Amino acid sequence: QEPNVPQPQPQPQPEVTQKVVIGYLALDDWEFENLFPTIEWKYLTHINASFARVKADGTLNINPVRKRIESVRETAHKHNVKILISLAKNSPGEFTTAINDPKARKELIQQIIAFTKEYKLDGFDIDYEEYDNWDKNFPSLLVFARGLYLAKEKNMLMTCAVNSRWLNYGTEWEQYFDYINLMSYDRGAFTDKPVQHASYDDFVKDLKYWNEQYRAAKSKIVGGLPFYGYSWEESLQGAVDDVRGIRYSGILKHLGNEAADKDNIGKTYYNGRPTIANKCKFIKENDYAGVMIWQLFQDAHDDNYDLKLINVVGREMME
């Protein structure tokens, strides 16, 4: 008879923390109806529905999102993707006015929490980009963040989009957020000199800066990927927006499919597939939280399915 030898117990596997892939989704995008059915949900963990607009009195202008937020939430949840409402200024100066006035600030906090609950969302995202008089206004922004953090329900996610390196957020900011989305793009884009607005080197520096200077945990830091570029080409002036921005889909349309594996053609600068892949690899190899995309509707269309940047992100981050 065999002695009663205890069987070896299976050892628990080390937990693999899933990387986040946060896609901004502009609910008032002019291509929404055509492109929403083509979203690659399997490669996303979160979407930030943009934007509910902050007014000076602390109320929200929800017209840009009201019509579609519920159907988008239902689709996201069906695919096990979390959805947050992203908050930005209504018109220049209004967000700042709201956070600087204690009464409006209190109203704004209540409105954000109420909106998140009413529409059964998973949280909210603060996209404050009023950079003038930063040092004067930042203390109010910090009070606002703390107030939101204390007012929210425990299971509500609280995230933000931040400027990558040239503003001082200090070491207090990060503690209130689950994820901090670094806008590692738009560098030098608003000048007359053609320039790469989102280089790999700057991406790496931004991530390290937030970890080392602002003491944000790597598990909160999310690197931003642009699905668009800028063009200074005379021949493309009819294809760009008022700040020379052009969607990745537009770059392929006007410059040809070979653009997909480059970062610039002539005076048009963007991130092609290899750079997007390398940025994702850096995130994984260095244990940052994940990547954020601005924004999903700028990607290649399904007639160029193999050239879609989201497929590169999905392959690198999920597989």
What feature does the model see in each segment?
Residues 25-26, 56-67, 110, 130-255:
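Substrate-binding surface in catalytic domains of secreted glycosidases
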Residues 46-51, 116-132, 183, 290-296:
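Short acidic catalytic loops
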Residues 13-116, 195-201, 208, 236, ...:
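Glycan-recognition patch characteristic of GH18 chitinases/ENGases
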Residues 47, 85, 126, 180, ...:
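Conserved, mostly hydrophobic/aromatic
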Residues 1-16:
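Bacterial Sec-dependent N-terminal signal peptides
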Residues 43, 218-287, 302, 306-319:
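Glycan-binding loop/region signatures in secreted carbohydrate-active enzymes
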Residues 19, 43-45, 79-83, 120-122, ...:
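Short, well-ordered coil/turn segments that N-cap beta-strands
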